[in-house]
């Protein structure tokens, strides 16, 4: 926290900087954490320079951005932004513990989460530094980039229910194999996504559980994830609709009942033009070169924070574009440039007229 040091009309408002401190299973050390540490270092540098900002600066460290323990993403940032659906608190983890119970065990009060939200009029904007999680910056030989928008995203959970049976006694023509239906759906999802290159459409099935899960038993149930993303809401929605139609056809043909549950649907979150300009100027001051703009295919806390305020993001080059992996890596030099760019961005926001 850096309190405002100069009087003026924005003295009672604050600029928010942050990211998340959770990550996926078997991941790296930079996804999310970099943005929190960069914000802390930026505060130190501003204080070292003796810069008096006309607004407060607050660093946020979000939890539950990834949706690993619970089937819901952006829980902390949605709380701060005042857009958390209270029914989410009843979701349970693999051990049956609801979110509200976990919060209570941690010392929180799930019945008063609404009081944690910022008021829109109190916030100037939200900035986040994050590794790119893709290969573009590295391929162009550039350390930093300006995020133009965060892609439209949908997450779904599918349950295929067939009929379990003996692997050796049920003829192939009489089977209702839930896993075989799921496998066909996976290939169908891939086919649909490959046709959406112009819309930056991607779709992934990354998790599947089969029951009863024995080598000599025909699978009676398969529960699996589906992640669909695109550069536009229309493209993502159209792909999801086509997947639903094809899933119905597969289920009918195979005699398998397939349900689709929507876990999350988030529209494109566009960065505010005035923040993009401030970030571009900050990056140019730090690197000496004009930065490029990039669409973020990965989801970020900005998708929730845009419900509260304008958002802007700085992307940092990562090796080979690898993320959500222990091989995830960013160099000290690039991270240092990101901190410099963040400082320069904050200075330009303090000097400028703000939202335009």
What are these regions (language model features)?
Residues 1-28:
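Acidic/His- and Gly-rich active-site-bordering loop/insert found
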Residues 17-20, 26-66, 154-160, 169-192, ...:
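Alpha-helical metal-binding/catalytic segments enriched in His/Glu/Asp
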Residues 18-19, 220, 290-341, 349:
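Zn-dependent metallopeptidase/amidohydrolase metal-coordination segment
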Residues 21-23, 57-68, 133, 164, ...:
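Acidic, glycine-rich active-site loops and adjacent beta-strand->loop/helix elements
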Residues 52-56, 113-117, 169, 191-205, ...:
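Flexible, glycine/charged-enriched surface loops at secondary-structure junctions
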Residues 64-65, 69-234:
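Midchain, well-structured core segments that form catalytic/ion-binding scaffolds
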Residues 148-150, 166, 170-195, 235, ...:
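His/Asp/Glu-rich mid-to-C-terminal helical/loop segments that flank catalytic regions of hydrolases
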Residues 204-213, 225-232, 257-276, 297, ...:
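A short beta-alpha structural unit
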């Amino acid at each position: 926290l850096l309190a405002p040091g100069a009087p003026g009309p924005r003295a009672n408002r604050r600029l928010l900087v942050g990211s998340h401190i959770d990550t996926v299973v078997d991941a790296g050390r930079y996804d999310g954490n970099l943005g929190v540490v960069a914000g802390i270092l930026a505060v130190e540098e501003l204080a070292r320079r003796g810069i008096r900002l006309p607004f407060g600066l607050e660093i946020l460290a979000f939890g539950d951005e990834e949706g690993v323990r619970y089937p819901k993403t952006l829980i902390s940032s949605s709380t701060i932004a005042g857009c958390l659906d209270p029914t989410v608190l009843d979701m349970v983890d693999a051990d049956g513990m609801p979110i509200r119970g976990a919060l209570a065990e941690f010392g929180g009060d799930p019945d008063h989460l609404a009081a944690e939200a910022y008021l829109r009029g109190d916030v100037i904007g939200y900035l986040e530094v994050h590794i790119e999680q893709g290969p573009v910056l590295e391929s162009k030989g550039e350390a930093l980039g300006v995020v133009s928008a965060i892609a439209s995203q949908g997450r779904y959970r599918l349950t295929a229910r067939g009929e379990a049976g003996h692997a050796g006694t049920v003829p192939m023509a009489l089977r209702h194999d839930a896993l075989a239906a799921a496998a066909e759906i996976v290939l169908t999802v891939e086919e649909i996504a490959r046709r959406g290159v112009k819309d930056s459409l991607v779709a992934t099935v990354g998790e599947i559980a089969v029951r009863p899960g024995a080598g000599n038993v025909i699978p009676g149930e398969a529960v699996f994830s589906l992640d669909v993303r695109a550069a536009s809401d229309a493209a993502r929605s159209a792909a999801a609709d086509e997947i639903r139609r094809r899933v119905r056809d597969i289920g009918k043909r195979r005699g398998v009942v397939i349900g689709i549950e929507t876990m999350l649907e988030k529209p494109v979150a566009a960065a505010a033009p005035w923040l993009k300009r401030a970030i571009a100027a900050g990056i140019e001051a730090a690197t000496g070169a004009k930065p490029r703009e990039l669409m973020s295919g990965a989801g970020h806390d900005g998708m929730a924070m845009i419900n509260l305020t304008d958002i802007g993001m700085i992307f940092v080059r990562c090796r080979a574009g690898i993320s959500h992996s222990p091989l995830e890596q960013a160099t000290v030099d690039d991270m240092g440039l990101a901190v410099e760019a963040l400082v320069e961005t904050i200075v330009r926001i303090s000097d400028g007229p703000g939202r335009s």
